[in-house]
Amino acid sequence: DENAVTYLALAAMLVKEINPDAITIAEDMSGMAGLAAPFEAGGLGFDFRMAMGIADHWIKWIKEKTDEQWSMGEIWWELTNKRSDEKTISYAECHDQALVGDKTLIFRLIDKEMYTSMNMDSKNLVVDRGIALHKMIRLVTLATAGDGYLTFMGNEFGHPEWIDFPREGNGWSYKYARRQWSLCKPDYLRYKYLMNFDSDMIHLFREENL
C-alpha cells in the first residue's frame, strides 16, 4: 500500500519537525524492511522498530521444551537477528503474554507455586529454578538488545497474574485491570528482589555503556 507507506514516512518527518527530540518507534508484524532506516536511504524514518519475534520465541521455548533442551545457538540467532541499518528495541515479554488467555513468562515458569511459595522462607525448587531462568531471560535479552530494551509493566518483578480490562465477558470487572506494585515492598516476598535485580541490571548496562 504505497499511500500508507507514504503517510507513515510523512508522519515520521512531521513529528521531527514539530519536536526534534521526539522518539518514534514502529511496531510492525509484517517484517517490512526500512521502517527504521533513514528516509534519505529509502526508509520510512522511524528511530526504532520493535523486535517483535523475541517475546514470542521465549514463550515458544518455555511451552514446547524443557530448559535443558533449549538450543543456545537458536536463542542467540533469534536474539541477534536484526537488520544492520535499523535500530531495534528488544523485550522478553509483551501484552500478548500478559493479557487474559495467556500466561506471563514467570507464571509459565513457576505456575501455581507462585501463590504459595514466593515468600523468602519457602524452599521450593520450582520457584528457585523459575526465578533463576526469569533473571537469565531478561539479562540475555538486554545484553543482546544493542539499541534499546523494553520492559512490559510487571515483568520487572515477576507479576503473577494476567491483565484483563473491563468487558462484557467478565461482567465489566476491574479486578485484573491492574499491576500489584505493592508486591515489591515487603522484604519477606521475592518480588522485591526480582525488582532489585532488574534495577541493578539496567544500572550496570547504563553505567558501563554496554
Language-model regions: role of each:
Residues S182-N196:
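A short, structured beta-strand-centered segment in the mid-to-C-terminal lobe
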Residues E2-A177, K185, I202-L210:
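Conserved alpha/beta catalytic core and glycan-binding cleft of carbohydrate-active enzymes
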